[in-house]
C-alpha cells in the first residue's frame, strides 16, 4: 500500500502517473489492485502515519522525506520528480485583465523568480541552505543542505521560468490519466512568453 495524498492533488497524480508508466496496475483506495494508492490520509500527517507503520511507501515533499530517513523510519527510494520527467509542478496564473493592467508588477514578480532560479543554479547547497534556513525553523542547516543537494542531484530546478509546451502537455497527460481533465487547453491560449 502506498500513501499518495489528497485525491487529484499533484503529488497523488504524479505518483499514479509514475507507477503506471512503470507498468504497475494502480487503483485509488482499492486494495484489489497491484498497487493501492491511499487518498484518505491528509497530506500534513502522511509522514507520521507512514512512520507509525501504515503503508509500504509514501510520497513526501522535502524536507519531510529526509526527516523520515533521519528518524530511521524509512528510506528515500526514488524521486517522483526525476521519474516523471520535467513537469510544471508550480505555475503562476492571473486573469488577462490583471495582466493588462499590472505589467510592471508581473515584470517585477517574474524577475524575482528568475533571480531565485539563477541563484539556486549557481550557488552551493550550503549557500542556499543558509539563505532559506529562516523558512525551515525546525530543520538544521545540515538537513536543509541535504535536501538542496538532493534537488541539485536530479536537476529539480529549471534554468528558465518559461512554461514549455512539452511540460504543459505532460501535465495534461498526467491529469488525463488520473481522469481529471476533460479537455486539453491550447498552449498558446493559456501561456504567455511575455515575461519569460
Predicted regions and their residues:
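Secondary-structure end/capping motifs
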Residues: 100-183
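Pocket-lining segment of extracytoplasmic ligand-binding domains
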Residues: 42-136
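Residue-level signal for threonine
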Residues: 95, 164, 192-194
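A generic structural-conservation signal
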Residues: 28, 59, 77, 142, ...
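Short, solvent-exposed coil/turn linker segments
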Residues: 25, 31, 78-80, 124, ...
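Hinge/cleft segment of the Venus flytrap/periplasmic-binding protein
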Residues: 183-196
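Bilobed "Venus flytrap"/periplasmic-binding protein-like clamshell domains
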Residues: 1-70, 85, 165-169
Amino acid at each position: 500500500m502506498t500513501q499518495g495524498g489528497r485525491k487529484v492533488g499533484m503529488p497523488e497524480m504524479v505518483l499514479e502517473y509514475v507507477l503506471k508508466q512503470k507498468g504497475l496496475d494502480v487503483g485509488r483506495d482499492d486494495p484489489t489492485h497491484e498497487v493501492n494508492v491511499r487518498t484518505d490520509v491528509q497530506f500534513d500527517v502522511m509522514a507520521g502515519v507512514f512512520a507509525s507503520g501504515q503503508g509500504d511507501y509514501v510520497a513526501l515533499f522535502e524536507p519531510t522525506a529526509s526527516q523520515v530517513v533521519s528518524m530511521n523510519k524509512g528510506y528515500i527510494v526514488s524521486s517522483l520528480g526525476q521519474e516523471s520527467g520535467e513537469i510544471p509542478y508550480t505555475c503562476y496564473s492571473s486573469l488577462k485583465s490583471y495582466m493588462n493592467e499590472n505589467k510592471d508588477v508581473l515584470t517585477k514578480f517574474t524577475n524575482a523568480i528568475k533571480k531565485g532560479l539563477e541563484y539556486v543554479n549557481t550557488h552551493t547547497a550550503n549557500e542556499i541552505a543558509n539563505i532559506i534556513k529562516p523558512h525551515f525553523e525546525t530543520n538544521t542547516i545540515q538537513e536543509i543542505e541535504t535536501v538542496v543537494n538532493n534537488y541539485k542531484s536530479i536537476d529539480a530546478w529549471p534554468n528558465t521560468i518559461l512554461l514549455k509546451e512539452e511540460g504543459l502537455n505532460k501535465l495534461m497527460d498526467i491529469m488525463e490519466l488520473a481522469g481529471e481533465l476533460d479537455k486539453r487547453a491550447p498552449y498558446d491560449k493559456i501561456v504567455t512568453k511575455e515575461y519569460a
